[in-house]
């Protein structure tokens, strides 16, 4: 793991003779280097190029990644909501050195760190809707970090959001606002970091096909109204982008569009957007549109 630590040159030695050689003739000792950008090797397994017929959804992901915005996607089953969400880390900037250390410490405290491992890629966490409150926000006998802290500096994907108990979703209010979560345990309280991009996904109704042009919805108006009120207003107020994700057509599924944006294309747009924000907010305590206070919008942004 030492070769990942900045300002330290690490050498490997199989025998004591290798160590003696290093001490006597260090210039002759070969240093093995490791490609620091290990994100690409991991993220290349999934790519936005695989997502067909969802250019609007991809555009929303670019905006979310560039401005650090929370997103809610609404669409029927099979429309591609999960594919859009799970590829978001592929277009986020690499973790800085400080972020790598912080993320590694979090996973170490949670007991999820493998031996001699330094986490170098953005976390992606996708808890199931049956997850307990303690597993989401943290807690238990040892006050371990929960999913929202394990997603720190990465992505928290809440799939089938209306299926989560309302009190579990409402527990996201504090971290979405302050990027921290306080876990109370007996006589002590613990503050854990929870700075992530939150992606909520939901069907438009219990059966999943309200408004779908290809399949008729069978939900009653009462069921529909009850379903649409499962997510509280304070949570929705903290979501920046809302998009409707329609099921791609049969032709979209068959034809691989050469003009469809790949993760590499989208990452370039994200990097350009983040650079523009750094220049715009160079003298401000915040550095992204997602952190922009309401009172500063008219002053710092041209919205005419």
What are these regions, as identified by a protein language model?
Residues 1-72, 76-79, 184:
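Peripheral, non-AAA+ core regions of ATP-driven protein-machinery
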Residues 30-33, 73, 96, 110-115, ...:
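Active-site phosphate-binding and catalytic loops of NTP-dependent enzymes
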Residues 62, 117-123, 134-156, 189:
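Conserved alpha-helical scaffold flanking the Walker A/P-loop in AAA+ ATPase domains
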Residues 72-113, 178:
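Walker A/P-loop
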Residues 75, 138, 160:
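The Walker A (P-loop) glycine that initiates the GxxxxGKT/S ATP-binding motif of P-loop NTPases
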Residues 99-132, 139-140, 288-303:
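Conserved inter-motif catalytic segment of the P-loop NTP-binding fold
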Residues 143, 166-304:
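Basic, amphipathic alpha-helical bundle interface domains used for macromolecular binding and assembly
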Residues 153, 159-161, 171:
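Walker B catalytic acidic pair
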